[in-house]
Structure formats: C-alpha cells, structure tokens
C-alpha cells in the first residue's frame, strides 16, 4: 500500500489520518531516521488546524515510544521547520499540515537533518517499515530508554532573524505600504513581525485562526479579498500565503494578481543582476508557460524543467547546481536561504526587487506577456491510468497536431484531474479544453 503522495502524507483527519495510523507512521519514520541518527532529536511543528493537536500527540507518542526526544514548537510555517531542523541539529523535522487544503484535511511532511524533503526512495523505505509488523512491535523502549518531549515557544525569533537576514542589508521597507493575508494559517504570527521590523507600513488580514478557518476563502488560493484591500488601502504590494506559508501569491499596486511564471522570470533576472545566481539556470516545472523560457533566454538564462512538486524543483536545482527555481503556483525556492518553498523569503525578495527597480509594482513585475493557458481541476471519482481510457491517445495526437501544449495528470494530494493547455490561439484553446472536460467527465466522474 502506497502511503506517500506528491507532498508527504495527506488525507482527512479522523478518516485516513487516524491516531493509530499516525502512530504507526511515526514509529516507521522514527526507525528510519534512527539508522543515521546523530542527535536523537526530532522537531515537530504544525499549522493552525484543529486536528493538528491530535496528529501531534500521536506522533509524539510514537517517537518517544522508540526512544526519540521530541521538540514541539507549535504553529510555524513549513519552511521554518526545514530551517530549524538543520539549525537546531535535529535528526529530522516533521510538519503537520495539509497546506492549501480545507481544514478537515491534514498531512505530515518529513525533512531530513539538512532540511530537505525526503526523496522517493526514502519514502519507500519508510513505507516498508510501516508494513513490517514484527519490526514495529519489537521497537518499543522501556525504562530510561523511553524518549522525552518538550515544548519550546521562543524559536520563532530564530526564524524571524533568518528571514531578515535574507533581505538586502542596504534596503529597508519604510517607503512601502504592504497588505498581508496570512490565510488564518501558520504565518499569522511571523509575517507581520518581519515586515514591521523592516519598516513597512503593514495591514494584516485573515490573521485570527480558530482551528477551522485556515484557507477559508482567503490566502493564496483566494486572493480576491487581498486584491480589494490593496486597492482600498492604496498599497504598493499585497502578499497572500497559503496555510503553511510555503506558497506565495503577489498582488501589485493596481490589485492585479501577478502570474507565478512572471514572478519566476523577473526574480530570476533580478538575482542575476545581483550576481546571486550560482549558475545560469532557473528551474521550473513542466507547467511553466513557454513565454517564461523565451524571456529567460533573452536574458541569457536557461530554463530547466522538472516534474510538478516543490521537492522535485529542489532536487532538479541540486542536480543543476542552481539556487533559484519554483512553480507557477507560488512555491518559489531561494536555496541560499530555504531548502523548500518559503513564501516569506520570496515576499521579501519581491519587495527588494520593487524597491531597487524604482518602479511601481505593476510595472516592475510585468516583464513579458504570457501565451494563453487554461488550467482546469476536475473532480474525479476514480483514477485509472489515463492511457487506458478509450480515445485518450487520439485526443493527445490531435492536440499535438494543432500545436497545443498539454499536461494532464492526477493530483497527488486530492481526487482531482489537472488539465493544462497552452496555445497561441485562445479561441482554439477554449474549444479544446471544453472537449477534454467532456471526455474526462464521461470517463472519470
């Protein structure tokens, strides 16, 4: 049975993520990390979901039962867990979050001692232990060998200092008015402090989590409220984070949502202008717009493609010795400062770019025009191999013949089929998307 999806383990709390399942997974992961243990410490953080308490307690019970000492730091962004795991010399870090999903869902993400998400082969090794009944039941410790757990509430200061260190020292934010939407999620404490301490005039919305309102019509998936507040407040920039703050959506001074590929392009060129790129490559996923590749090429930068998911972006960056890359969804990695997507690091870099450009953000963040793209997320009841669907191959051949770029895949975290089409003719794009929707609705819904 496969446990891991494209971003850790995710599911409905109390259905897939039951206390027994979480404890078993915690023991399996702990036994895997113990093979290379240096400090016998594991760090645990979470977002603001109500079910986070249940999942956290199950993980603590599991890990201490096999002798691990656990450090609990409460609600913190996912990238903070990645940073603090390495900074505090832990064997591993665990983030309890379902990211942008509704509050009923939850998830578990694992980081190695260097703050990187686990590779697929590492996840498979944990799955093998998960299914090894004899090994699991022979691993409990007794007496003084049982692990301990302690809660530390002041590590937020380390992460705030780290974020401020990522911002250019010769700049401050005193000339910028910024609206922050923290999605009632993990960034609700950190984000306002960072931007205020750097001098910005800050308005914060959706910063009152109650355990059930994370991502609820707010944050990176629902930036319309942020757009309205930016216009109302006459702000220079707006930043929306998702529930665990590893994703960023940017709104310019006119209230326009800045496309993720435009962000990747302009930030890549900005990093190059500061001689901050470790190579002449920028990494993006297969979903990236062709216009991004053309723009980067015009700036003497090469675009490297990878599979969808920020951990695959990170792996491709390491492979190509690149220190910048991301997804158009807003997971953007500056690996000099973060091993995974960090919405706050990215927001600070966008702010620095706008300041140094001496332009309003609607100009500074609009460096090129995109080719028409259409993305549809289709709810599905089943997930058979797409190649097994009668007529699927013929559809793809027709798209290729019409020079329509296509990427069709199942979501790794939800019961959805994602359909992405890109073409120079927008009307043709719309008609073919409708045709594809009808085809898949007939086969999968």
UniProtKB/Swiss-Prot annotation:
Q: Which cofactor does it need?
A: Mg(2+)
| EC numbers, comma separated | 5.4.2.10
- MF terms (GO), sorted A to Z: magnesium ion binding; phosphoglucosamine mutase activity; phosphomannomutase activity
Q: Mind telling me what this protein is named?
A: Phosphoglucosamine mutase
Bound cofactor: record note: Binds 1 Mg(2+) ion per subunit.
Q: Name one GO cellular component term.
A: cytosol
Kindly identify the residues recorded as the active site: 99
According to the UniProt record, list the residues that bear Phosphoserine: 99
What is known about what this protein does?
Catalyzes the conversion of glucosamine-6-phosphate to glucosamine-1-phosphate.
Its recorded reaction(s) are: alpha-D-glucosamine 1-phosphate = D-glucosamine 6-phosphate
The cross-references to InterPro entries, in alphabetical order and at most eight, read: A-D-PHexomutase_a/b/a-I (IPR005844), A-D-PHexomutase_a/b/a-I/II/III (IPR016055), A-D-PHexomutase_a/b/a-II (IPR005845), A-D-PHexomutase_a/b/a-III (IPR005846), A-D-PHexomutase_C (IPR005843), A-D-PHexomutase_C_sf (IPR036900), A-D-PHexomutase_CS (IPR016066), Alpha-D-phosphohexomutase_SF (IPR005841)
Q: How is it modified after translation?
A: Activated by phosphorylation. Can autophosphorylate in vitro using ATP.
Key words, A-Z: Isomerase, Magnesium, Metal-binding, Phosphoprotein
Query: Binding residues for Mg(2+), per the UniProt record?
Result: 99, 242, 244, 246
Q: Which family does it belong to?
A: Belongs to the phosphohexose mutase family.
Q: Name one GO biological process term.
A: peptidoglycan biosynthetic process
Checking Gene3D superfamilies in the record gives: Alpha-D-Glucose-1,6-Bisphosphate, subunit A, domain 3, Alpha-D-phosphohexomutase, C-terminal domain
């Amino acid at each position: 049975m496969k446990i891991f999806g494209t971003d850790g383990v995710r599911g409905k709390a109390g259905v897939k993520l039951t206390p027994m399942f979480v404890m078993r997974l915690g023991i399996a992961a702990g036994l895997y990390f113990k093979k290379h243990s240096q400090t016998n410490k594991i760090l645990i953080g979470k977002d603001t979901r109500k079910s986070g308490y249940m999942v956290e307690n199950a993980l603590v019970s599991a890990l201490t039962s096999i002798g691990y000492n656990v450090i609990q730091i409460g609600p913190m962004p996912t990238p903070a867990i990645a940073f603090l795991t390495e900074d505090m010399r832990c064997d591993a870090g665990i983030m309890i979050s379902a990211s942008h999903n509704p509050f009923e869902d939850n998830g578990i993400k694992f980081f190695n001692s260097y703050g990187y998400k686990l590779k697929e082969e590492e996840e498979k090794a944990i799955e093998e232990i998960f299914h090894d009944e004899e090994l699991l039941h022979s691993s409990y410790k007794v007496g003084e060998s049982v692990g301990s757990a302690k809660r530390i509430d002041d590590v937020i200061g380390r992460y705030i200092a780290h974020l401020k260190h990522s911002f250019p020292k010769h700049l401050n934010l005193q000339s910028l008015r910024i609206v922050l939407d923290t999605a009632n999620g993990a960034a609700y404490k950190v984000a306002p402090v960072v931007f205020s301490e750097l001098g910005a005039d800050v308005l914060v919305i959706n910063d009152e989590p109650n355990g059930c309102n994370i991502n609820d019509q707010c944050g990176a998936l629902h930036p319309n409220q942020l757009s309205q507040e930016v216009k109302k407040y006459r702000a220079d920039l707006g930043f929306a984070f998702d529930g665990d703050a590893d994703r960023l959506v940017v709104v310019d001074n006119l209230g326009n949502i800045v496309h993720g590929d435009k962000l990747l392009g302009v930030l890549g060129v900005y990093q190059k202008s500061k001689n901050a790129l470790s190579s002449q490559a920028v990494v993006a996923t297969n979903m990236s717009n062709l216009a991004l590749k053309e723009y980067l090429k015009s700036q003497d930068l090469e675009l490297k493609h990878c599979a969808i998911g920020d951990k695959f972006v990170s792996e491709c960056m390491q492979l190509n010795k690149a220190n910048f890359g991301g997804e158009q969804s807003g997971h953007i990695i500056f690996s000099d400062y973060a091993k995974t997507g960090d919405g706050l690091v990215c927001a600070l870099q966008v702010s620095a770019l706008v300041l140094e450009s001496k332009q309003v953000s609607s100009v500074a963040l609009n460096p090129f025009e995109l080719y028409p793209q259409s993305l549809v997320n289709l709810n599905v009841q089943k997930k058979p191999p797409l190649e097994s669907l009668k007529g699927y191959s013929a559809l793809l051949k027709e798209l290729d013949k019409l020079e329509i770029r296509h990427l069709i895949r199942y979501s790794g975290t939800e019961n959805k089929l994602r359909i992405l089409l890109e073409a120079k003719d927008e009307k043709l794009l719309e008609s073919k998307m409708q045709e594809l929707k009808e085809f898949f609705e007939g086969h999968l819904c």
